[in-house]
Each structure stands twice: as structure tokens, then as C-alpha cells.
Amino acid sequence: LNSTVVNVRNRDDGLVDASYVVAGNAQTVRAKRCILAGYGGMVPHLCPELPPAQKESLAYGVKVPFICTNVLLRSGAAIRKAGVSSYQCPGSFYSLVATAPPVSQGNFQPPTKVDDPLVMWMIHAAAPPASGDQSSRDLYRLGRHQLLSMSFEDIEAATLSQLSGMFGATGFNAETDVEAITANRWAHGYAYEYMELHDPVWPEGEAPHELGRAPIGRISIANSDTEAHAYVQSAIDAAIRAVNEIL
């Protein structure tokens, strides 16, 4: 834990070496088998012995970049007065704006009064408008560059501007209502999922994620990228497959 893997390789004696860095020190652990679970695009760099065609397959999917922002409001009166809990905002910086789901745990109950605090949850999909010549993978790469070039001040300004535009008429005041903003930048966010508009339809077993996840020696490859699906159930499916490969 808290270590960064930098190399995984099959040894001539049938074992596997995994090299990693922890607390500034390089270490190597030796094992009978290994599951390499991580961002598919990084796997070829961590395991250079992969054949070129498999490296190309692993590099096909491009992670979807996001900014997930939480805004804590001292008073949620202006939002509650609007009477809507979720907004789709095409063309705006945040395409989705919603009140965070209320959480009840033990003796804790969420605020319910009109003037009680409220958390807003906002999603920015960092991809520029398509020119017509770009694939979704091209747009995700451009969006990642855009996302990483933004400062917190840029994100803060866009956040306050959109909230003011949406809820100013119901009394929202950015100067007095906002207690805190937390912006989570996911430069490499969701696993790539194929789109009929941009991707071919491959025969079963020949899609890039299927070719890319083939075991090499005693190393198996997992992560949701190997399922071409971004959610936890896919990561679990990948883990089960990889474990079965090494048993």
C-alpha cells in the first residue's frame, strides 16, 4: 500500500518481479504470479515485454476526463426555493448540477429546513465541442489538456458564475452563501466505453479491451478498462477473471 509500481516482468525461472517505490526507496518483490490491475494505457509502460499488438490494444481506450465539484452552502434557501433537485445544463461549464443526496447514518439526520446548509454536486465533462473530424477519443485527450491547464481560480469562477446564473433569481448570493468549494479533477476518469458513432463493431473476443487483457506469462491484467465499462461491477468482473487465470 502507498507504493507506486514502476515495472512488472516475468523471470526466466518462472517467477514474477514487481518493482515499486515507497517513501522514496525502490524495492522489488518476487512472486509466483501477479495481477496487474491499473489504467490500461499505463500497462505497456509497466510491463514492456508485452507484444506490440497487445500494447496497441491497451492504448486504444482513452480515459474520460471530469471535474466533480462539491459546493457547501451556508444556506440552501435559494436552491430549495427553485423547487428542483437536478438540472441538465447543455452548453454550460457544468452539464449536470444537483443537490447532493441526503445521507442518514446512526443518529445523524440531514438538514431539512429551508435555511439549513446544503451541498451542491456539479459535473464538468472536459471535452470541447466536436468539429466533425474528431473521434470521442480525440475529444477526451483535448479535454484532459484543457482540464489540467485550469487553475482552481478558473474552476471557482466558473462554479460561482453558473450557480449565480441559475439561482440568482431565487436569492442566491455567492459572496454570502458559499462556505466551501471542493473540486476533484479526474484527468483520467472513467474507463472508455465504445460508441457506435466512432468505434467499429468487433467480433467477440477481438475488441481492443479483450485483446489487451490477455495474460502474458504469469502476469494477468485487470481493471475496469479491460471490460470497456467504467463501473464497479466491471472492475469486480475483471478481478474474478484475472484470479481465475492464475489459479
Label every PLM stretch briefly.
Residues 1-3, 150-151:
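Short beta-strand to alpha-helix junction loop
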Residues 2-132:
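Mid-domain catalytic core of redox enzymes
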Residues 72, 78-247:
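Conserved flavin/dinucleotide-binding core of flavoenzymes
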